[in-house]
Amino acid sequence: MLVIINGADTDVPESTTVTNLINQLELTGRIAVEINKQIVPRSEFDSRLINNGDMIEIVHAIGGGQST
């Protein structure tokens, strides 16, 4: 099925969960996922299914700040 990930058309298998998608994309670390402009809580990654046509944004959380 076709979804949009960070602005790019991407084909993913049916019954793909957020966790499956993260693993397929080989992403690690602290990740935030938004599907159709709704943040997906990490507690739902294993159960939240990706649907055909979903618009998905995935970002890495990066720590940092100003040191003095």
Task: Name what the model sees in each region.
Residues M1-T68:
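Ubiquitin-like/PB1-type beta-grasp interaction modules and other compact soluble beta-rich domains
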